[in-house]
């Protein structure tokens, strides 16, 4: 435990928070040097900006493929990915609000909607995963988003009650006073997520794997999310027991989630869909050329 404490005290890791971190340095000064630290904020902002820029760069081609494929669920998922990416970009750029006096309410609202949006994408993908294959009908869209909407609606309601009803600082980390009840709630939250990903991981390695899509990308996605949520669960449990190393470790998992989850989701789900569209177009072109007699000479 002494080694863990020394790691948490290291000047090269994410800075700890205090209630008045930006009281003397202002918004910019707090963002650069005090609220979480320069490295923490820079990684978040750069990763989110690069991903939004990539989405914008690919937007014309992606919209063209979506309109040709006419997959309702993919169109809706792509649109929601854009919305959540912009929310996450705002969240990453406004980190100083977390430790700026007077910004607690707006920070809680921004974090609540950003994390709920990202969780909606997670739950939607898991719900869609259990359908076995890509579906393009309105029924599949309704079923997937109905499940996700119910789960996220309940999650958002409970968090709002704890935030604004009981005054539990769910989204404001304070190293000077560890709120054990808050971290107990996060332990339950992370335990549920880790349990779901663990169940799917087990299914992929059991006789029930035929019920899931036979796609290596999905298996890798589940493995990464299981590891991330397992590590986050461990960090929350440590923090709930008063270990400052747990707070530092939780900060690392939070950075990884907000910086890299949306790109991981895109690579796993949408990029694969767009690649399939390219292959489908190549097959169509080949069939048309074959029907036109372009390959007759090869058989002579």
Curated annotation (Swiss-Prot):
Q: What induces it?
A: Induced by the N-acyl-homoserine lactones (AHLs) N-3-oxo-hexanoyl-homoserine lactone (3OC6-HSL) and N-3-oxo-octanoyl-homoserine lactone (3OC8-HSL). Triggered by melatonin in leaves, cotyledons, hypocotyls, roots and guard cells. Induced by osmotic stress.
Q: Name one GO molecular function term.
A: melatonin binding
Gene of this entry: CAND2
According to its UniProt entry, the function of this protein is described as:
Plays a role in plants and microbes interactions. G-protein coupled melatonin receptor involved in root growth mediated by the bacterial quorum-sensing signals N-acyl-homoserine lactones (AHLs). Binds to melatonin. Phytomelatonin receptor required, in collaboration with GPA1, for melatonin-mediated stomatal closure involving H(2)O(2) and Ca(2+) signals. Essential for melatonin-mediated plant response to osmotic stress probably by activating reactive oxygen species (ROS) scavenging ability.
Residues that span the membrane, as ranges: 37-57, 73-93, 110-130, 152-172, 183-203, 222-242, 245-265
Task: Please give the name of this protein.
Answer: Protein CANDIDATE G-PROTEIN COUPLED RECEPTOR 2
Q: Which GO terms describe its biological process?
A: G protein-coupled receptor signaling pathway; regulation of stomatal closure; response to mannitol; response to molecule of bacterial origin; response to osmotic stress; response to pheromone; root morphogenesis
**Into which family does the record put it?**
Belongs to the UPF0359 family.
Q: In which tissues is it expressed?
A: Expressed at low levels in seedlings.
List, alphabetically, the InterPro entries matched: TPRA1/CAND2/CAND8 (IPR018781)
